[in-house]
Amino acid sequence: MVRISKQAGNGMTRRGLLQGAAVGGVGIAGASLLPAPTASAVGASNGFVFPGVDVVIDGSHATTDVTLLVREYLARKSEADPDGTMTFFSRNPVTYIDAVLGWSWYDWDSLRTALGQFMPNWPKEGKSYPTRILGNSTGAMVFFTDTAGLFGSSEIRAVGVINFSDRRITRQIDYWDGRHFGISDTAKLRVPTDKFPADFRESTVGETAAQTMKNVSYKLARALRNGDGAGAADLFAPGAVFEDVPAHVQIVGPRSIGSYLTGTASLLPYSGQGTAVRHIVGSATGGGYEWTAADGSASRGVIALELDSWGKITRLTAMWDGSQADDSMLVSLSQKAIER
């Protein structure tokens, strides 16, 4: 079964809502009907909602503590409060990189200075809010949206790979689709190629992901590197969903997923011999890995994974910079999703 989707991975499905309600321990579905809380009430027992935004955070594959921590962090960011936002970051080590634009900060003071320059210019109603969180308090994949006006005329729907130590962020790398933001707007903001960071500082935080997440990530990455769609399909649960955000493709079921991965082995930027795992985060049920590619349309990106209790993939979301790919490649990726 194949569905061509809009910006996948940032909505709240009925399945995810019900799962989140079961995991969260509080009445999430009921909480979504409550008036939006003020930012000062963000830590209250009001379910996984977000102040000022009509959204229910999908925390079905995250621990409650990291969901609340991320919500508090982004609520403070949404208040355009540089000092408050920086209380969520470690003094040392700290790394923050935008993997699309190449903007980078490697110490607390420089990041604080940057926020102090950005935030006063944000629109009053601007928000940076989470929609889905995968992982635990050591590391998580955070799907979040920066509304229009924060960093340009369009919204940014990103996946942040975040490492934590003692409830402080030690490393955050943001991946998003430059086509959704606008190809020309993205190009204007991107640093020159010779200035783009080569080291994403994963060595400063180490590999703390759960062993199950590591095992699945490495097996999947190896199958994709070898163009082994059938081997990759074996890692998926019967009702699994595969979604590639820049390609606007969603596929359901291992057989169809395997067929698609076989047919696109030479097209997908995270498939082929030049690909490698950069860093893994998450728990035994939610997380994923950053990847790099020596060749192809995009040189870096992220694979977010939801796993069931047997370690099978129930949902895979791929995020990379589609502005680096030409139209014909994206058309080919869509055509390969047509089943026969």
What do the PLM-derived regions correspond to, one by one?
Residues 22, 41-83, 87, 182-230, ...:
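Short, low-complexity N-terminal intrinsically disordered segments enriched in polar/charged residues
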Residues 45-57, 116-211, 265-273, 278-340:
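A beta-strand edge to alpha-helix "cap/lid" segment located at domain peripheries
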Residues 11, 60-64, 105, 210, ...:
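Short, solvent-exposed loop/helix junctions and linker helices
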Residues 68, 79-139, 229-284:
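A solvent-exposed, acidic/Ser-Thr-rich amphipathic alpha-helical stretch
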Residues 14-21:
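N-terminal export leaders
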